[in-house]
Amino acid sequence: MDIDPYKEFGASVELFSFLASDFFPSVRDLLDTASALYRDALESPEHCTPNHTALRQAILCWGELMTLASWVGNNLEDPAARDLVVNYVNTNMGLKIRQLLWFHISCLTFGRETVLEYLVSFGVWIRTPPAYRPPNAPILSTLPETTVVRRRGRSPRRRTPSPRRRRSQSPRRRRSQSPASQC
């Protein structure tokens, strides 16, 4: 079965393929962040959001994986085989867990739409040849102000007039109006 853990959140595994494995913080740092920011909601018996539930599940999966890794470490006598298992878990499973934790913590911190925009913006940025892209990659925490990929609709901020258009210092002349048109 090919299950995409991001599908119900509007993302996909492919969106993460543009982010290097060293982009994601360590599992320990992510767990510390989740605990510091969302401990009450994660430990609450009440349902908060789908992101909280998914984050809870990812944390539980990591705990089970660490239990298995400890068992393997204690019971597998061949050091080469033990190293292979530990390396596989850290490289493959560790990356998947780090991606999941990062995604759900980021959604809770910045909002799902912002995180999705970031993933799309970064994917566009990284695929654009260096000669044609801005020098700096999109940054998640500043994305709403700097993103190139915008949602349809009006921009929430007002645009200021172009600095090239200077207004005259003299008062503006008004056309004379007929008395009938003044209300």
UniProtKB/Swiss-Prot annotation:
Alphabetically ordered keywords of this record: Capsid protein, Cytoplasmic inwards viral transport, DNA-binding, Host cytoplasm, Host-virus interaction, Microtubular inwards viral transport, Phosphoprotein, Repeat, RNA-binding, T=4 icosahedral capsid protein, Viral penetration into host nucleus, Virion, Virus entry into host cell
Compartments it resides in: Virion; Host cytoplasm
Motif Bipartite nuclear localization signal positions after renumbering to this chain: 158-175
Pfam families for this protein: Hepatitis_core
Location of region: 3 X 8 AA repeats of S-P-R-R-R-[PR]-S-Q: 155-177
Highest taxon of source: Viruses
Sequence repeat intervals: 155-161, 162-169, 170-177
Bias-annotated ranges (Basic residues): 149-176
Residues annotated with Phosphoserine modification: 155, 162, 170
One Gene Ontology term from the biological process aspect of the record: viral penetration into host nucleus
GO molecular function terms listed in the Swiss-Prot or TrEMBL record: DNA binding; RNA binding; structural molecule activity
Post-translational modifications reported in the UniProt record: Phosphorylated by host SRPK1, SRPK2, and maybe protein kinase C or GAPDH. Phosphorylation is critical for pregenomic RNA packaging. Protein kinase C phosphorylation is stimulated by HBx protein and may play a role in transport of the viral genome to the nucleus at the late step during the viral replication cycle.
A GO cellular component annotation in the UniProt record: host cell cytoplasm
Region (RNA binding) location: 177-183
Region (Disordered): 136-183
Quaternary context: Homodimerizes, then multimerizes. Interacts with cytosol exposed regions of viral L glycoprotein present in the reticulum-to-Golgi compartment. Interacts with human FLNB. Phosphorylated form interacts with host importin alpha; this interaction depends on the exposure of the NLS, which itself depends upon genome maturation and/or phosphorylation of the capsid protein. Interacts with host NUP153.
Function: Self assembles to form an icosahedral capsid. Most capsids appear to be large particles with an icosahedral symmetry of T=4 and consist of 240 copies of capsid protein, though a fraction forms smaller T=3 particles consisting of 180 capsid proteins. Entering capsids are transported along microtubules to the nucleus. Phosphorylation of the capsid is thought to induce exposure of nuclear localization signal in the C-terminal portion of the capsid protein that allows binding to the nuclear pore complex via the importin (karyopherin-) alpha and beta.
Family: Belongs to the orthohepadnavirus core antigen family.
UniProt-recorded name of the protein: Capsid protein
